[in-house]
């Protein structure tokens, strides 16, 4: 595990840590076209990225994610941008770090930057072609850039397999920053690759994660169920519950969720008290 963990320190002080909302969904509202990689906005439209960060901080987020979810070489290769991993992730972390500085200057409240690391989109051997060594190198390139840009923690998210979590965690640890990893669980109480919340809790201990939890999924109720499964394992690490506001639907040229702000506020209180 890493040394100092600012998220754990914040939880010890406040009792909880409030994270941000849906970065991608907010970008759609600002003109991002479906299929276009939001990571490129870190350099093309930094003012839009900064505005979303500022809005989350103004809403009370203690921690927020960088605009780098798909910022690894394998994902960026789909857009002929695999050679831009370093510059895009450094920019993502710098934009977020600058937002924390602006917020502190006006409010005196300290907030944290979580360097978002999403999945590669590839299957691991024997089901696919990606092996552990290759995956570690892909994730290391991104993790090092996020650390260089000023991330406080590295946030591995929306994973489905322990193999990919292991590779991303190994890579992230080379930075010396605290590492969080979250899986996405479905209605069967397991990830797409069959990992249960309790399995994941034990795995998190085995690979010495600093934080773990669940994110995304199909809605807050199901996410709370996964969170309870992790907590029931008796794990002593900070537990993350960061769900969708329901199932996203494409309507009238935009992404909509069937949940509401009130629903998410209630879910946040339930998650705090699990």
Describe each region flagged by the PLM.
Residues 1-274:
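Domain-level signal for soluble alpha/beta catalytic cores
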């Amino acid at each position: 595990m890493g040394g100092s963990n600012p998220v754990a320190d914040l939880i010890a002080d406040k009792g909880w840590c409030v994270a941000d909302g849906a970065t991608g969904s907010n970008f759609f509202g600002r003109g991002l076209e479906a299929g276009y990689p939001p990571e490129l906005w870190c350099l093309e439209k930094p003012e839009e990225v900064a505005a979303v960060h500022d809005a989350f901080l103004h809403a009370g987020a203690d921690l927020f994610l960088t605009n780098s979810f798909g910022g690894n070489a394998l994902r960026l290769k789909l857009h002929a941008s695999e050679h831009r991993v370093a510059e895009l992730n450094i920019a993502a972390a710098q934009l977020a770090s600058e937002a924390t500085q602006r917020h502190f200057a006006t409010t005196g409240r300290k907030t944290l930057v979580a360097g978002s690391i999403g999945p590669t989109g590839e299957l691991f051997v024997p089901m696919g072609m990606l092996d552990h060594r290759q995956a570690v190198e892909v994730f290391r390139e991104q993790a090092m850039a996020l650390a260089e840009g000023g991330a406080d923690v590295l946030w591995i998210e929306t994973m489905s397999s322990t193999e990919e979590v292991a590779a991303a965690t190994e890579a992230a640890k080379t930075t010396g920053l605290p590492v969080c990893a979250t899986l996405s669980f479905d209605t069967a109480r397991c990830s797409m690759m069959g990992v249960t919340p309790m399995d994941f809790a034990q795995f998190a201990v085995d690979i010495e994660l600093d934080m773990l939890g669940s994110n995304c999924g199909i809605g807050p109720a199901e996410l709370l169920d996964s969170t309870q499964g992790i907590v029931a394992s008796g794990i002593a690490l900070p537990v993350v519950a960061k769900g969708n506001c329901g199932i996203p639907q494409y309507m009238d040229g935009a992404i909509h969720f069937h949940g509401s702000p009130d629903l998410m506020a209630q879910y946040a209180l339930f998650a705090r008290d699990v």
